[in-house]
From Swiss-Prot:
Residues 50-95 are annotated as: Disordered. Residues 332-334 are annotated as: G5. The gene is infB. Residues 196-203 are annotated as: G1. Belongs to the TRAFAC class translation factor GTPase superfamily. Classic translation factor GTPase family. IF-2 subfamily. Residues 221-225 are annotated as: G2. This is Translation initiation factor IF-2. PANTHER family: TR-TYPE G DOMAIN-CONTAINING PROTEIN, TRANSLATION INITIATION FACTOR IF-2-RELATED.
């Protein structure tokens, strides 16, 4: 049912909002908070009838009084009436104009300067400052006053001031809604991202697709790299995001931008599944995006397609010709063999997905990439996901905004409009947005600016309140509050056997309240990619006999990702189980106080092995624990047996200095080893 705001109805009835609120409460028992509240149309019609009835009765009474007076002195009164009627008409006309002109002045923020409100009220600065002084407020032209003060000030000049609460954001919510009626939806082309291991031919495959489908009439093909492009097969378009690699894919997903419909997983026929291929598979599964496997380099002598298919089955991907549902297409980027088959499979998969959009609505989509061009200003590549975008439209992009001055397609041609699944490069934004930011078309540039300003304020507030990620210590509380329905884990170990054993044991811990899911498992040190995946999935990283590298530590501290390392699998399982049951009560916290690199090794018969080391970070302390890390894997854990600076014993050695050290019960130190020094710090018990 339609609704009308209180101030709109008051304006229509030519009465103040306060009078209307009083009338609603007394006559109709309708409670309203303020002038921005909305009431049903039925109530509005009743109020109109009531007021029109009162006006008629008052008018009848006035006419009766007028007839009575006229009867007493008809000639004189008729002359006076003519004059007064003219005056009244004139007065009524002025009042009507004033009522229309008064309108509603608005504030978009919590404060407004004296200069701005003076301009809105169309009063001189002196008049406004004088009124403020009478209200006990001393303010200069450039000083700000709050909304309550502005409201009182406006009332002094018979004006009404409103605060635009979340109207623009409400408009955006309407744009965000995808519950389109079926009759308005039309088929759209699929959006594809290419992923896979380094040197498996991702870029070569993209180039092969692009070159084979760009016609000779396009003056050498694509003249401008905009981060995405469209190719055609049998009259149907396919949009490729030219951002090979899973880093961009995950970074965009971490920002909430799900733009990809299908992922092409490139696997070299002569190399098989590699670590980055595993990560790409994990990313696709976590994002719940269908994938097509392109087995590349089939022209190479050592190509073995069946071996690749066999390895894929280990990750739950069974080829169609082996009785599964994973599409595998043998291709060669070098000879162009299988390119058309791959494109046909993409179109077939998109038909099954039934991808649709409504071109006859306000546009929305995602930023693929953006940059600052010296000659053109902020330049952004947008992928339109719904609606139609036109030159001249005003858009909000993340916390920036703008009016589209020019728009180019993937061939570098100037275009006036673009529909769903189309990549375009635009000019006209106030600032450079970030990849993954969503954009929405709004009614005008003023609205766009207002929304962008509010978003900047929100970002500032959110920055002050750090994002609360999942950690083992507060997992039980979050489960009880219902904020965690699924616990995502990234498992890294020194050998594959440990990864598999742990995955199986952890997934058995799932309960009705929370499901435990291992998003990714791999061998080797914990790296920045693992942290990025954990950030995107709001997961926890578990390491066994492995340590995080420096980049991973920095990223985890920045993003608030919890990294737990263990020596025994049983300890990890017990920790997760205890956290889920609310029994985890940590008593000690391990604090790494410094690291040193072994530069030289000396063997002394009576003493053992002495390492000459350089302290890279923090400090080394004599009574602290010590780990020997080789190629990112912990090979021994003990404590420092001795620590010397030149020939003297030292309690500690600071960063930037060299020292001599030995590890308790360990002599197999080698050059290049990293010695990690740590202490166990007692912390207060947490009640979960």
């Amino acid at each position: 049912m339609a609704k009308i705001r209180v101030y709109e109805l008051a304006k229509e009835l030519n009465i103040s909002s306060k009078e209307l609120i009083t009338l609603l409460e007394e006559e109709f028992s309708v409670e309203v908070k303020n002038h921005m509240s909305a009431i049903e149309d039925e109530d509005a019609d009743l109020i109109k009838e009531l007021l029109s009835g009162k006006e008629k009765s008052e008018k009848t009474k006035e006419e009766d009084d007028e007839i009575e007076t006229t009867a007493k002195n008809p000639i004189k009164e008729s002359i006076n009436n003519k004059k007064s009627n003219k005056r009244d008409d004139k007065k009524e006309k002025v009042n009507t104009e004033n009522a229309e002109d008064m309108g509603i002045i608005t504030m978009t923020s919590d404060t407004i300067t004296v200069k701005e409100i003076s301009d809105k009220l169309e009063k001189s600065y002196a008049e406004v400052i004088k009124e403020l002084m009478l209200m006990g407020v001393m303010a200069s032209v450039n000083q700000e006053i709050n909304f309550e003060m502005a409201e009182k000030l406006a009332a002094k000049f018979d004006m009404e001031i409103l605060k635009e609460d979340e109207d623009e954001e409400e408009d955006l919510e309407d744009i965000l809604k995808d519950n389109e009626e079926e009759e308005h939806l039309q088929k759209r082309s699929p959006i594809i991202t290419v992923m896979g291991h380094v040197d498996h031919g991702k870029t070569s495959l993209l180039d092969a697709i692009r070159k084979s489908k760009v016609t000779s009439t396009e003056a050498g093909g694509i003249t401008q790299h905009i981060g995405a492009y469209t190719v055609e097969l049998n009259g149907e378009a396919i949009t490729f995001l030219d951002t090979p690699g899973h880093a961009a894919f995950t970074a965009m997903r971490a920002r909430g931008a799900q733009v990809t419909d299908i992922v092409i997983l490139v696997v070299a026929a002569d190399d098989g599944i590699m670590p980055q291929t595993q990560e790409a598979i994990s990313h696709c599964k976590a994002a719940n995006v269908p994938l097509i496997v392109a087995i590349n380099k089939i022209d190479r002598p050592g190509a073995n397609i069946d071996k690749v298919k066999q390895e894929l089955t280990e990750y739950g991907l069974v080829a169609e010709d082996w009785g599964g549902d994973t599409i595998c297409v043998p291709v060669s980027a070098h000879t162009k063999e299988g390119i058309d088959d791959l494109l046909e499979m993409i179109l077939l998969s998109s038909e099954i997905l039934e991808l649709k959009a409504n071109p006859n609505r306000k546009a929305k989509g995602t930023v693929v990439e953006a940059k600052l061009d010296k000659g053109r200003g902020a330049v952004a590549t947008l992928l339109i996901q719904n609606g139609t975008l036109r030159v001249g439209d005003s858009i909000v992009v993340g916390s920036t905004y703008g009016r589209i001055r020019a728009m180019f397609n993937d061939k570098g041609r100037n275009i006036k409009s673009a529909g769903p699944s189309t990549p375009v490069e635009i000019l006209g934004l106030s600032e450079v947005p970030e990849a993954g930011d969503k954009f929405y078309q709004v009614k005008d540039e003023k609205t766009a600016r207002g929304i962008a300003d509010k978003r900047k304020e929100k970002i500032r507030d959110e920055y002050l309140q750090s994002t609360h990620k999942v950690s083992l210590e507060d997992l039980y509380n979050q489960i009880q509050e219902g904020t965690v329905k699924e616990l995502g884990l990234i498992v890294k170990a020194d050998v594959q056997g440990s990864v598999e054993a742990l995955k199986q044991s952890l997934e058995k811990l799932s309960t009705e309240e929370v499901k435990v899911r291992v998003i990714h498992g791999g061998v080797g040190a914990i790296n920045e990619t693992d942290v990025t995946l954990a950030t995107a999935s709001n997961g926890i990283i578990l390491g066994f006999n492995v340590r995080p590298d420096n980049n991973a530590i920095i990223a985890s501290e920045r993003d608030g990702v919890d990294i737990k390392t263990y020596r025994v699998i049983y300890d990890a399982i017990e920790d997760i189980k205890s956290a889920m049951l609310g029994m985890l009560e940590p008593e000690f916290k391990e604090v790494v106080i410094g690291t040193a690199e072994v530069r030289q090794v000396y063997k002394i018969s009576s003493v053992g092995t002495i390492a000459g080391a350089y302290v890279q970070t923090g400090k080394l302390a004599r009574n602290a624990g010590a780990r020997v890390i080789r190629d990112g894997i912990v090979i021994f854990e003990s404590e420092l047996a001795s620590l010397k600076r030149f020939k003297d014993d030292a309690k500690e050695v600071a960063q930037g200095y060299e020292c001599g050290l030995s590890i308790e019960k360990f002599n197999d130190i080698k050059e290049g080893d990293i010695i990690e020094c740590f202490i166990m710090e007692e912390i207060k018990k947490k009640t979960l």
